[in-house]
A protein has these predicted regions:
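Short glycine/serine-rich loop segments
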Residues: 147-183
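Basic nucleic-acid-binding alpha-helical/helix-turn surface characteristic of O6-alkylguanine DNA
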Residues: 1-146
Length: 183
């Protein structure tokens, strides 16, 4: 196994440039703890290609690569995550500000909406240092659910903030890509 492969996240430091606001929803009642009235979005070019960035009053709530799907499909997918919001396309960040967010040199507030389990997984992903990778199994053990590897993989696949929440740093135990969206 590579020296970059983490088998324990307990000693990892969380990215200090990220502040997380958590909002939960209940699958049984389809109710959320927050109701956004407006999300502003824009498409920016990045080293990863065309990128969708979404912002609410509480912070960034969406970051997605348009890759082969195209802008319309990616925007439609992200809108499903925030069904009660209204959307407006507008300039959110200058090119310089956007690069500083992707480079993680700018303080950024993230607004996460998901189940308590999903948010627990996404926050654990923030513990993986730049340049390191870990496995679904290690992540499952870290959050205290060692048998929930597939459920964790599903939560990772629903990560609304690719790159900032590093789902791409989680691999199968054998070091191969898992194939869950961007991770």
């Amino acid at each position: 196994m590579s020296k970059n492969f983490l088998t324990n996240l307990d000693k990892s430091k969380r990215n200090k440039n990220v502040k997380v606001h958590e909002f939960f929803y209940s699958k049984s009642s389809n109710e959320t703890t927050i109701n956004f009235s407006k999300i502003t979005y824009q498409f920016k070019n990045s080293t990863f290609g065309k990128t969708l960035i979404m912002n609410s009053d509480m912070g960034l709530c969406g970051l997605a690569f348009c890759d082969d799907l195209g802008k319309d499909a990616v925007l439609a997918d992200m809108k499903l995550r925030w069904p009660k919001a209204s959307y407006k396309q507008d300039t959110i960040f200058s090119d310089k500000e956007f690069r500083s967010i992707l480079d993680k040199t700018k303080q950024v507030e993230l607004c996460l909406l998901g189940s308590k389990f999903q948010i627990q997984v996404w926050k654990a992903l923030l513990k993986i240092p730049t340049g390191k990778v870990t496995s679904y199994t290690t992540l499952a053990k870290y959050i205290g659910k060692p048998k929930a590897v597939r459920t964790i993989a599903t939560a990772i696949g629903k990560n609304p903030l690719c790159w900032l929440i590093p789902c791409h740093r989680v691999l199968r135990a054998n070091g191969e890509l898992g194939g869950y969206h961007w991770g």
